[in-house]
Every structure is written in structure tokens, then in C-alpha cells.
């Protein structure tokens, strides 16, 4: 049998956060088929950057990061719709998530 952790993703992907809607914490999952410099940002619906969760060169694999609904200063953000975006090499993808209070 093959261990799933040995199987690498075939394509870059940003997956839907879980849980969604969420309060107070959600997990953002993403797939890296190759080593890449990864940046993950949180934006509000006006396009303002709220936080940066990842800024690192990462090895290929199935990865995840948690967001605790705080901004870059550690302050809780208000309920609403937020965007999360991955930039990994040339790959960019954005998804929506909902924070309930």
C-alpha cells in the first residue's frame, strides 16, 4: 500500500477553507506539486490586506495553515466575507470565506 503522504499533488490548488462559515478559527488547505515560494494573504471585500499567513519557500505536498480571524496586529476582525489568496511561483488563486460572530 502507498502512504498518502508519499503521493504529491499533480497541480497547484487552493482548496476551500474548513469549516466555512467559521468562528473563531478556520483551516486553509493548499496543494504544492513542486517546491515554491508561497505567500498566503487575507483580504477584506474592499481589497485591503488584513493579514499574511505564509511567506516561505515550501516543499511540495498537501499543506494547510490556520487563520484565527485576526489582522496582522493580532486584533480580531469583524464578521463578514473575506478573501484568501495564494501566490506560489506563477500560480495565483483566490477564494471566499465567511466569518460569523
Please name every model-derived segment.
Residues 91-95:
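Extracellular and select intracellular beta-sandwich modules with Ser/Thr-enriched
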Residues 54-89:
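Short, surface-exposed loop/turn motifs with a glycine/proline- and acidic-biased composition
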Residues 39, 66, 96:
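Conserved beta-strand and immediately adjacent loop positions that scaffold enzyme active sites
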Residues 33-37:
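Short proline/glycine-enriched turn/loop motifs at strand-loop junctions of beta-rich domains
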Residues 39-43, 52:
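Beta-strand signatures of extracellular beta-sandwich domains
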Residues 48-54:
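Surface-exposed loop/edge segments in extracytoplasmic proteins
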Residues 3-31, 43-48, 79, 98-101:
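Surface-exposed, proline-anchored Ser/Thr-rich loop/turn motifs
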Amino acid at each position: 500500500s502507498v502512504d498518502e503522504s508519499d503521493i504529491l499533488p499533480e497541480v497547484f490548488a487552493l482548496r476551500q477553507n474548513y469549516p466555512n462559515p467559521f468562528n473563531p478559527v478556520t483551516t486553509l488547505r493548499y496543494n504544492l506539486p513542486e517546491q515554491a515560494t508561497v505567500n498566503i494573504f487575507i483580504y477584506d471585500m474592499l481589497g485591503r490586506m488584513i493579514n499574511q499567513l505564509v511567506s516561505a519557500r515550501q516543499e511540495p505536498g498537501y499543506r494547510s495553515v490556520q487563520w484565527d480571524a485576526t489582522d496582522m496586529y493580532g486584533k480580531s476582525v469583524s464578521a463578514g466575507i473575506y478573501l484568501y489568496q495564494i501566490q506560489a511561483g506563477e500560480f495565483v488563486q483566490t477564494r471566499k470565506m465567511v466569518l460569523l460572530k
